[in-house]
């Protein structure tokens, strides 16, 4: 190996392109090219930095923080004031990812004026690049107002967790006669100006049909393999969630077990007087 190669001047490998900030236009381009991409939730600086380093292009600061950060049973109780500090941390930790902030229940349903005030606050106070809200035709006016104001909107149809009480629990949406309404919802949010749409717990065949109909990217969670992108709650994805998880979850690691092992070893070494050792002392 030559000295030039060691210092990078004459390497046979192509020079890696510097990473660029992901924009909504990239997602549109990827759909046109048939390039699938991954989205993960994130709720703090350190996790966001790890996911950004891993090349995850889109991070969602979801109202799922209600469950995995604050310990609520559903996403309904979480407030704007509880979400905003989390979004700030994620934005600071992920210089390359597109960061999307969830609008919590009760912060946009009254109409376009309320939705605009809430979304504006999120963008101004956190640095988020886009917002997400739940609903199809019923929130089309809110989406149109935000889009007209220059605020990128990710829509969310199918099973909408904020409506869990009205939907009668965690149930697949869009089966049978309800499929037509799900299609109408997808078209409505696209026409209103959404740059992408999450489809949650929708039959795979229906999600495939909708993905083919839309020009904006679809993001699946429990919606089969043919969406343009996929999203998971990171604690589910990494194996930190304890107990039973949804059918659509695949565990790609066992972070929970490793955390328990490390914490147990730390406690044992402190109790035994092994830690801190000389090399950890000044």
UniProtKB/Swiss-Prot annotation:
Domain of life: Bacteria
Protein encoded by which gene: panB
One Gene Ontology biological process: pantothenate biosynthetic process
Cellular localization per UniProt: Cytoplasm
Protein residues bound to Mg(2+): 63, 102, 134
Protein name listed in UniProt: 3-methyl-2-oxobutanoate hydroxymethyltransferase
A single GO cellular-component term on record: cytoplasm
Native species: Mycobacterium sp. (strain KMS)
Name of the top EC class for this enzyme: transferase
Obligatory cofactor(s): Mg(2+)
Magnesium found in the keyword field: yes
Assembly and interaction partners: Homodecamer; pentamer of dimers.
């Amino acid at each position: 190996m030559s000295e030039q190669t060691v210092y990078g001047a004459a390497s046979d490998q192509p020079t890696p392109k510097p990473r660029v900030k992901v924009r909504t236009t990239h997602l549109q381009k990827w759909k046109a090219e048939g390039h699938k991409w991954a989205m993960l939730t994130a709720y703090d600086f350190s996790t966001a930095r790890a996911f950004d380093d891993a090349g995850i292009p889109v991070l969602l600061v979801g109202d799922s923080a209600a469950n995995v950060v604050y310990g609520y049973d559903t996403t309904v109780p979480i407030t704007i004031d509880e979400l905003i500090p989390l979004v700030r941390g994620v934005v600071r930790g992920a210089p390359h990812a597109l960061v999307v902030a969830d609008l919590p229940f009760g912060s946009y349903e009254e109409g376009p004026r309320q939705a605009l005030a809430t979304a504006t606050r999120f963008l101004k106070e956190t640095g988020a690049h886009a917002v997400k809200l739940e609903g199809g035709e019923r929130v089309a006016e809110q989406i149109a107002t935000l889009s007209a104001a220059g605020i990128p909107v990710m829509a969310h149809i199918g099973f909408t967790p904020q409506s869990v009480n009205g939907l009668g629990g965690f149930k697949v949406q869009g089966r049978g006669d309800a499929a037509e309404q799900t299609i109408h919802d997808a078209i409505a949010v696209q026409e209103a100006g959404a740059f992408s749409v999450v489809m949650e717990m929708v039959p795979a065949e229906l999600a495939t049909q909708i993905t083919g109909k839309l020009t904006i990217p679809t993001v699946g969670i429990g919606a089969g393999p043919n969406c343009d992108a996929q999203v998971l709650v990171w604690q589910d994805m990494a194996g930190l969630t304890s107990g039973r998880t949804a059918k659509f979850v695949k565990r790609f690691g066992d972070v929970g077990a490793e955390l328990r092992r490390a914490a147990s070893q730390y406690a044992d070494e402190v109790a035994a007087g092994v830690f801190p050792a000389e090399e950890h002392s000044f």
